[in-house]
Every structure is written in C-alpha cells, then in structure tokens.
Amino acid sequence: LSVFIFIFVAQTASAGVANLLESESEIKGSFLFQKGIFTHHWNDRFNNDTDLYSLEYYSDNDWLYGIARFQNSFYQPSWYVYTGKEYPLKEFFKLQFKGKITAGIMHGYDDEDGKYNTIITRFKTFPIIIPSLKIVYKRFEFDIVALAHEGFMFTTGLRF
C-alpha cells in the first residue's frame, strides 16, 4: 500500500510541478501529502521514529479528509482515518498560521498480552481528536501536532 501511495503522489505531483510556487496557498479541491519528520515523547521508552505518511483531501466546502500510516508509540504499525477542519489564525508576511483539528478512528494499538497496559491498547481501535498548529508558505506546509499528553510531532507536506 505504501508503494501505491508513493506512486500516486509522485505521478500527481509531477503533473503539477510547474505550479509548485504559485502564490495561492489555500487550494480548494486539493491533496496534501505529509511526512512526519520529528517525534518526541516525554517518556524515552516510547517510539520517536514514527515513519508517518499521510494523504489529506481538502474539499471545496473547507473540510478535510485523510488517512495516515505510522508506527505508534509501542513500535506497532497503525492507521488513522479522519476528517477535520483548518482555521486561519494569522498571516505574517507570506506565512499563514492556522489551527487544525481532526477527529477519526485510530487502529493498531495492541497490548501484546498485557505488555502495554493502557486503555488505548486494550481497545486496539478507538476514536480520537488531534489538534495541531500549521505554518503554510505557498504550497508547502509544516505542522506541529500534539500527541495527547505524551509528546509532539513535526510534519512537513506539499499541497497539490
């Protein structure tokens, strides 16, 4: 599946290379491909190499829909399927600052027969809300994502 997503993104992105530096940064009916570039947990026993990839679709009615694949805090492959919305906060020079909130279903947390005794690993699949702050420059995006009370993550992305 990761190969399919990569090929899809590469083909779609190559078709729009000439438009990468357009001044319009909020493109309706567009996709955003993101990669997690840094993760930090307050507890060192948790995974800080999440290998996150996500693909989001931004509709004409300001809603976003997405899917993300990553290695969770317990080094297990996981998925997040979600919807959400962005909220403009401030524009400073050519940078746009936005708030973003997503809500969806996360799957892949397993307690491995009691090895990880947390509420989320007992359910394996659970609803979740994730807030983030975003900096946008033209079609390039950078997010700071809150990981509940466990830490934070930085992602970077390209809108096409």
For each of these PLM feature ranges, what is it?
Residues 27-69:
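N-terminal leader/targeting helix
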Residues 40-49, 69-80, 123-125, 141-159:
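Solvent-exposed loop/turn segments connecting transmembrane beta-strands
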Residues 35, 53-57, 67, 81-87, ...:
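Residues on the lipid-exposed face of transmembrane beta-strands in outer-membrane beta-barrel proteins
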Residues 46, 97-128:
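Outer-membrane beta-barrel translocator/channel fold
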Residues 1-3:
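Sec-dependent signal peptide recognition
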Residues 9-12:
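N-terminal signal peptide c-region/cleavage motif recognized by signal peptidases
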